Each structure stands twice: as structure tokens, then as C-alpha cells.
Amino acid sequence: MSSVVVVGTQWGDEGKGKITDFLSENAEVIARYQGGNNAGHTIKFNGVTYKLHLIPSGIFYKDKTCVIGNGMVVDPKALVTELAYLHERNVSTDNLRISNRAHVILPYHLKLDAVEEERKGANKIGTTKKGIGPAYMDKAARVGIRIADLLDRDVFEEKLARNLEEKNRLLEKMYDAEGFKIEDILDEYYEYGQQIKQYVCDTSVVLNDALDDGRRVLFEGAQGVMLDIDQGTYPFVTSSNPVAGGVTIGSGVGPTKIQHVVGVSKAYTTRVGDGPFPTELNNEIGDQIREVGREYGTTTGRPRRVGWFDSVVVRHARRVSGITDLSLNSIDVLTGIETLKICVAYKYRGEILEEFPASLKALAECEPVYEEMPGWTEDITGAKSLSDLPENARHYLERVSQLTGIPLSIFSVGPDRSQTNVVRSVYRPN
């Protein structure tokens, strides 16, 4: 048995899709365990760039099983669209498996997401408006509709009718918005269910059988630890648990079957959406990093907020996710910056904080304590090993590893999978 979890150590967009794609080559099963189509990942495969939101990165390998786990919330319309997107590009999806226990995003979730965000005005969270939060709310309230329900027309119709009574009342009375008729949803979404029916099964059985058979299983997280509903910058978070612990709940695999956790980070920090960001750069260096790193959201297209590497954030991620391996991406983006800074702690009302505070009010008052390091000007995009890097780049990686307390296992010097380099295997035995 060999199992590896890939998690983002920051606020998402760390390049998890690329690293998952890279690690997929030596995996036999690739599974997502939380989130929905609010997560976007860009993958280059055989010279072609693909943008996916729901389907795991391993779909491009015909000999590997790809799983959408029970912890995900699935927009059937978005899923059918993504399947068509792959089919048009001659990518087979025969290896896809979808949990019959995953919850379904319906049109009223999308509308509630949008009107609630609009109502909040200046206090908005920065949601992607994909219906993720409202779908997870229904799940917690035990009124959600699952994939298994979607496939049974009678059950789907009964639950949909009951839910629409409540949702329409909410939309019309609280938000002064138009509600839905059952015929607006029933036939269309039942048909989507029929289109994905061939992929639906009990994915917990698929995953546990694979692990028991000694196959390599790779769990692909979405978003990042700082967007985790329990461990992130609440309430500026997602509605699920991207931390490694989310694997056990969101995939139906017990915690004793998880071996290694790869924490993916950029060599700097980015964020989409609102919320405190201690190392944010609102200057020319920030603009340079954004343009060189093409820091625009895969899902939203929004410019990402950019800042220096924050070791306080990544140490927090290491602790709450049990991270065993560091994958550092986008090192090449920092080329040409004369002096680099790494945040080693926060200063809060005269006190030095080395751990991430829970209070957003306190976080907003925190000033980053920086350590400066000399940059490099050499082109590093062709580096294949640490020894190929200029001395200053090597020292930067070493210092990041020291400050976060995570051994460096992978580093990346460009967007292509050929620019991803292994320092030590994450599939090693315990």
C-alpha cells in the first residue's frame, strides 16, 4: 500500500494540479475528496494545456482510475460540460468514477450564492458564486440531494419539490428575487444524471480495494489549508476541509491508510478574494510577480493578490495537515528580483508571533517580520537538480525548508511538467 495526499499550504492556486499531474504518472488511482468546480487547475499534457475544475488531474492517463469522492459537491451541468470538453479533445473518461454519496449543486444553490454575496456588500467573502457554500449548507442541514438521488427520478422529484418550497420562500421573501419552478430543473438535471450514470458507484469500495491490493493512490486536494473551514482564515474560507484530514471523511478511507502528505507552495504567496494577507505587495514588485507568474484565477479570471513567502502560514499548514514533504513551485518567477524577503514571524502590538493567529482582527494588525536574502539573475528554467541552481536560489530553497520545518521533496522552475524536479520520492516506504 502506498498513499499520498497533495494539499495546498496557502490560499489555493499553489500549483497542486500540476504537481498532482506529475505525481499521477507513478500513481494508479487519483482521487479528489472535497470542494467542487470552484477549484480550477491548469495542466499541460503532451504539449496541450487543459483547464479542469471537477475532474481529477489523472484523467489523461487511460490506465489510471480517477475518483470524484463523496466529500465533493458536484454541479451536474458543469460536470457534463467538462466531460464534453475532454471528449472534444479526444481524452477518454472511461476511467472516471463518481461517488453515489456526493452531494449535488442545483440552480437554486447558484442563485442563493450570488444574492447572498451581493447582500453582504462590503462584507462579502469573495465566493466564486458556484453554489458551493449553499450546497454544503444543505448537506449539513440534512436536506441535500445526493448523486444517488439524482439517478432515481421519483426520489429526485420528491426531494426537489420539498427543497424548492423552502428555497423559493427564502429567495422571494428575504432577497426579493425570483424563485424556481420544478419544471425549470427536474427534466434537465435528471438528464444530466443519466449522462453521468455510467461513472457512478461506491467510490469508498474502489479506493479501499485499491489500497488493500497494494496499489498507489494519490489524493488530490482543492483550494488550500488557509481556506479550510476549520483551520483557515475564517470566514474568508471555503465550505469544506482541504486539510489532509479531509481525505478520510471525503473519500471514505480510514486515517491509518494515509502515509505521506505533500504540501504544495509557491515560492511566494498569492490569494484570490477578500481577507487579511500580511505579506501582500501593492507595489511594482507585486505587479512584476503577478505578470511574470500569470497570476490570474483559473476559475474566476480575477487578478490574484501577491505577496512574499510567508513561513508562518506554511508552518501552520504543516502542523494541521501533518505535511511530510514540501513541493515548492514557481521559483523561476522570482528571477531578477534583487532582494527577496521571507516572512519569519508577525509583530502584533509589540509582541512577536511565530504561529498563525485565529483572530482576523489581530491578523489585520499584524506586521510581517522579514528576513532578507539576495536574489539571482540567472535563467533557472532548465534546472534539473538542486546543483543546477545558482547559489542564491539554492539558499532560498534551503531557508524556506528550514523555516517551515518541511523537507524539500519537489521543486519547480516553470509551468511545464518537464520543469518539475524530484529531490526525494514521495512514494517512499514509511
From Swiss-Prot:
Lineage top rank: taxon: Bacteria
Catalyses which reaction(s): IMP + L-aspartate + GTP = N(6)-(1,2-dicarboxyethyl)-AMP + GDP + phosphate + 2 H(+)
UniProt enzyme class: ligase
GO BP: 'de novo' AMP biosynthetic process; IMP metabolic process
Pfam hit, one: Adenylsucc_synt
EC number: 6.3.4.4
GO MF: adenylosuccinate synthase activity; GTP binding; magnesium ion binding
Active site: D13 (proton acceptor), H41 (proton donor)
Keywords recorded for this protein, A-Z: Cytoplasm, GTP-binding, Ligase, Magnesium, Metal-binding, Nucleotide-binding, Purine biosynthesis
Note on cofactor: Binds 1 Mg(2+) ion per subunit.
Pathway(s) served: Purine metabolism; AMP biosynthesis via de novo pathway; AMP from IMP: step 1/2
Binding site for substrate: T298, T299, T300, G301, R302, P303, R304
Keyword Lyase: no
Cofactors named for this entry: Mg(2+)
Binding residues annotated for GTP, in chain numbering: 12-18, 40-42, 304, 330-332, 412-414
Binding site for IMP: D13, E14, G15, K16, N38, A39, G40, H41, T128, R142, Q223, T238, R302
Annotated Mg(2+) binding sites: D13, G40
Localization of this protein: Cytoplasm
InterPro entries linked: Adenylosuccin_syn_GTP-bd, Adenylosuccin_syn_Lys_AS, Adenylosuccinate_synth_dom1, Adenylosuccinate_synth_dom2, Adenylosuccinate_synth_dom3, Adenylosuccinate_synthetase, P-loop_NTPase
Quaternary structure and partners: Homodimer.
Stated role: Plays an important role in the de novo pathway of purine nucleotide biosynthesis. Catalyzes the first committed step in the biosynthesis of AMP from IMP.
Record-stated family: Belongs to the adenylosuccinate synthetase family.
Name of the protein in its database record: Adenylosuccinate synthetase
Organism this protein belongs to: Bacillus licheniformis (strain ATCC 14580 / DSM 13 / JCM 2505 / CCUG 7422 / NBRC 12200 / NCIMB 9375 / NCTC 10341 / NRRL NRS-1264 / Gibson 46)
